[in-house]
């Protein structure tokens, strides 16, 4: 039934069905006693019940006692009055809600962020798990690009991130607030909303996805502009943080733990694996000059030992495929919300500081071994603030030119030469003059036929020559060290480089034969006199023999003589 206004302020209702009387029922009185009911109830009593008046218990007549239908003029007048009253009622409500136009209500699940660069002003980007999506499930993200001011870094954008849970919103605020991204400081707080203009006018809002309020909000969360300028809404935010901290003291640790789990606990040294000169893939995050140094460096920093499935580091990089714009000039997976870049946000007064996971010494790289200084990719960091070393850029004092050789190899060879010289100097005094004189008494000097050969008289017996050659390795151990260099009895002219040849030529007397240097000192000619009938190794010789030793290493010749065998390179000529 439609509502019908009466002369009174409140509409007349049927006493039986408690429904407002229609316009036609206003002048309907079925009983002579004057008890007024609606025509619906009158018809029901007469057809389904006893047909008696509920007031006087008299039977209802066939026709109502009083019934005066309204004319068209009266009906139009009543409708106009009804419409006017409705307008007055709406106006009264609008006047009562007019003050709500300047009221803002804090939304517990809404995060308001300012200072975003234009590159990050994308709802789909901010919804990703490596960005705001890491703190909880997001209901909606709205970007506001109509920022009226622009700083030195260009215009910035703001964003409204609506979470499903209020706890996730508070966690995001604590992790994002006061962080520097792209040279801009992000500011995050609980967002406020206003009342819908249709709600203020007491009208139906035509927008199905309207984000404004269409009902009265919490009185404790409602603040006027003056109260917000005084910081009342921030006090309310701190109050919510205190309540959440009391219920769950580790609510911040939950988010941090999940980040470390996804990143495999990467350290700042494991963050980089690509060159930082890619402006489209990297950001500069840092404080002051650190950010400038990172952005200006063109040197890529290798990962210090952790496989890059997440890097830096990590950045380990099981999750390096997704790069957060909140990360530093580094391209790996460490998010702006990690502890390395978090700016301390105020903790609610009266509360102990948030528990933080202790830093173990194992989290920092140890000093490498000396031999690994030129091969290890890990650069030791003296302090956590030494970002140049942490990022692997090295010191600016280090020479940048290439030496072209291995310093370790050159030093090792030079040291070996020095040791060799020292040993040769120690062996020279062992050649005493007495031994040289005794040796010379058994030799004679003679010039044999042909130039360029040394002739020697034969020793008294064959065993003396063998014993003489056996002395050579003992007297001159350096000779064996260089035996692979020479293929004959060759004496190089540079005695300084080979100190084992620095002894006098008469020291060859230990060979029990006369050694006369000739113009060609590359060979020795051993000429045996004819009176001996026994040659080297006990081989009988019929006449004078000329033994020419050539193209045989000294060590091989002496070894064969010691064994009593005839060397294969000895050529015997019978005169």
UniProtKB/Swiss-Prot annotation:
InterPro entries, per database record: CNOT4_RRM, Mot2, NOT4_mRING-HC-C4C4, Nucleotide-bd_a/b_plait_sf, RBD_domain_sf, RRM_dom, RRM_dom_euk, Znf_CCCH
Reaction equation(s) it catalyzes: S-ubiquitinyl-[E2 ubiquitin-conjugating enzyme]-L-cysteine + [acceptor protein]-L-lysine = [E2 ubiquitin-conjugating enzyme]-L-cysteine + N(6)-ubiquitinyl-[acceptor protein]-L-lysine
Domain RRM: 109-189
Pathway info: Protein modification; protein ubiquitination
Skewed-composition ranges (Pro residues): 345-358
EC number assigned by the record: 2.3.2.27
Top-level taxon: Eukaryota
PTM annotation: Autoubiquitinated.
Zinc fingers, C3H1-type class: 190-217
Coiled coil in keyword set: yes
Function: Has E3 ubiquitin ligase activity, promoting ubiquitination and degradation of target proteins. Involved in activation of the JAK/STAT pathway. Catalyzes ubiquitination of methylated RBM15. Plays a role in quality control of translation of mitochondrial outer membrane-localized mRNA. As part of the PINK1-regulated signaling, upon mitochondria damage, ubiquitinates ABCE1 and thereby recruits autophagy receptors to the mitochondrial outer membrane to initiate mitophagy.
Keywords: Coiled coil, Cytoplasm, Metal-binding, Methylation, Nucleus, Phosphoprotein, RNA-binding, Transcription, Transcription regulation, Transferase, Ubl conjugation, Ubl conjugation pathway, Zinc, Zinc-finger
Pfam families for this protein: RRM_1, zf-RING_4
Gene from which the chain derives: Cnot4
Protein name: CCR4-NOT transcription complex subunit 4
Biased composition (Polar residues): 281-299, 307-322, 425-446
Oligomeric form and interacting partners: Interacts with CNOT1 via its C-terminus but does not stably associate with the CCR4-NOT complex. Interacts (via RING domain) with UBE2D2. Interacts with ABCE1, PINK1 and PELO.
UniProt subcellular location: Cytoplasm; Nucleus
Residues recorded with modification Phosphoserine: 71, 301, 324, 432
One GO term (biological process): ubiquitin-dependent protein catabolic process
Coiled-coil regions listed: 68-104
